Amino acid sequence: MLTIKDIHALEVMDSRGNPTIQASVILSDNTKASAIVPSGASTGKREALELRDNDKTRFLGKGVLRACENVNSVIKHHLIGLEAINQAFVDERLRALDGTPNYANLGANAVLGVSMALARASAKALNLPLYRYLGGANALTLPVPMLNIINGGTHANNSIDFQEYMIMPLGFESFREALRASTEVYHTLKKLLDGKNQLTSVGDEGGFAPNFSNNVEPLEAISQAIEKAGYKLGEEIALALDVASSELVDENFNYHLKGENKILDSHELVAYYKELVAKYPIVSIEDGLSEDDWEGWAFLSKELGRQIQLVGDDLFVTNASILQKGIEKNIANAILIKPNQIGTISETLETIRLAKHHAYQCVMSHRSGESEDSFIADFAVALNAGEIKTGSTARSERIAKYNRLLEIEHELKGGIYIGKELFKHG
């Protein structure tokens, strides 16, 4: 029986220069694997708790030595000797060890690091790629990338309210061709922005962070870039938004669009989205309303839910019980999947199974604070997620995921790129 022989954690750096955890697991056959935990900038209030040191003398309070110590002591002590390939049992032991619903004791960053490293070590010991170990024989589908090519909100220091303006290359036969087309649009957009004397510095996720005067100008610029790059707007490459509305809302559920000097209530904001969807080929809107504005979400879902994908991120925080509430209320039709929002790989799988059972699309996602770790690329293929958000085709921590997906596509001898079929199954 393959068992856990040793576990340890190290404080390393993420793509924003903040500390994070690298957890390593060694198995009884001396197989070793590691995983680096990501971290978000805009976070949902119901996310699992990321444990930070709050010691202002180190990393401005953002150190993770306490979380590392939890791995190196409590977690290590209780997990050594357990069967490695029984991921669900080990993850349940981690949950019980913490004893809180949001990992407030051990830290979700400590727990997830170990959970990820264990999956990777077990796959390695069995001589299986991670996607095959997690997904079995049915892991064949390459996801449609949602490439964030203009950044705003908390991901960039500019006047754009919406956090992410994305492109989705739907009209292609392979992931490789879809990624190539997206990269050409990205570089074409840079030239267009240069020509308008706009900034082409990049945000946390590799997208450009220009100072447009309102939230529509990025849609115009991206549409121009798609056509100038030689692709059919809406047919080959569509648009998507992550509004991150929880960052814009006040206590009365009024939404402050500072870039446009507007304050809108839920119904007015939904009307604004309807105007945008009518004018531009927007196929997906994420976090269109605040995580607490459930009445607004119900209205948004009623007005646009049959027309486009409505993704809950802060709304659901990868939590099966919260998703169940959304299903019962007919809220949204898709969920963003971020393992560090919930804590372990097994809990993430539970949420995905629930979503798929109720025909909610699943979008595998990175965080704004990332690393060279490409776990989510394998995870997306393992689960036939259909979509992945992992930034632009810039910054090496984003490219690591795309390169891994290219590698997987090659291993699968092409696999299945869902492309145009994505929303036909929704």
Curated annotation (Swiss-Prot):
EC main class here is: lyase
| Residue sites binding (2R)-2-phosphoglycerate per the record | Q163, K338, R367, S368, K389
Tell whether Cytoplasm is among the UniProt keywords: yes
Catalytic center residues: E205 (proton donor), K338 (proton acceptor)
Record-level Gene Ontology MF annotations: magnesium ion binding; phosphopyruvate hydratase activity
Which reaction(s) are listed as its catalytic activity?
Answer: (2R)-2-phosphoglycerate = phosphoenolpyruvate + H2O
Supply the NCBIfam families for this chain. Answer: eno (TIGR01060)
This entry's Enzyme Commission designation comes to 4.2.1.11
Q: Name one GO cellular component term.
A: cell surface
What is the protein name stated in its UniProt record? Enolase
Q: Does the keyword DNA repair apply?
A: no
Keywords on record = Cytoplasm, Glycolysis, Lyase, Magnesium, Metal-binding, Secreted
Q: Which GO terms describe its biological process?
A: glycolytic process
> Where is this protein localized, as stated in its record?
Cytoplasm; Secreted; Cell surface
| Cofactor info, note text | Binds a second Mg(2+) ion via substrate during catalysis.
Record lineage = Bacteria, Pseudomonadati, Campylobacterota, Epsilonproteobacteria, Campylobacterales
Q: Which family does it belong to?
A: Belongs to the enolase family.
Q: What residues bind Mg(2+), as annotated? A: D242, E286, D313
> In which pathway does this enzyme or protein participate?
Carbohydrate degradation; glycolysis; pyruvate from D-glyceraldehyde 3-phosphate: step 4/5
Q: What does this protein do?
A: Catalyzes the reversible conversion of 2-phosphoglycerate (2-PG) into phosphoenolpyruvate (PEP). It is essential for the degradation of carbohydrates via glycolysis.
Its required cofactor(s), as named, are: Mg(2+)
